[in-house]
Amino acid sequence: GEAINKHFISESAKPQFCIVGSGPNGAFPHHHTGDRKVKQGDAVLIDIGGRKGTFPSDMTRMSVLGEPPEGYLEIHDIVERAVQAALSAARPGVMAKDVDAAARNVITEAGYGEFFVHRTGHGLGIDIHEPPYITATSEVVLDEGMVFSIEPGIYLQGRFGVRLEE
C-alpha cells in the first residue's frame, strides 16, 4: 500500500484507501489488514482509491504471484465476461437492475451465483459510494453523464476472490 500511496501523492492526489487481500484473504470483499504475507501461488486482490480535487477514484485489479491457484483462470475469465456484459448493458434508458442482471447472469450461468455476494456497482461523484447503485432491485433509470463502477466478483472462501472494477 505504501508504494500506491506514494504514487497518488506524486500525481497530486490524496490516497483514500488500499485494500490488498492475498490468497484466502481475497475471498473477503473488503478485507482488513492482517499479518498474512503474500505467498507463491496467491491470487492478490487490490482495491485502491484516491481523491484529486473534489472527485474520488475507485479501482480493483487482480494479480498472481507465480503460478495461479487451481481454478483461478476460469474464475477470472467468468468475472471478465460479467464485467463486459454489464458494460454492454449500461446505457441511457436502461434500469440499473438490468445492468446488475447482465453481470449476475454470467456468473450464475457459470455456476458461481452464490459466490457473488455484493452489488454490481455504485455511483462515483462527490462521494466514493453514491447513487446510482447498480443492484438487483434498483429501478433507477440510467442517464447520460452518470458515472458508476461495474465491479462483479466471485469469492471462494478459504481459497481466493476475484473482482474486477471498471
Residue ranges and their predicted role:
Residues 1-166:
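Active-site neighborhoods and metal-handling regions in enzymes and metal-associated proteins
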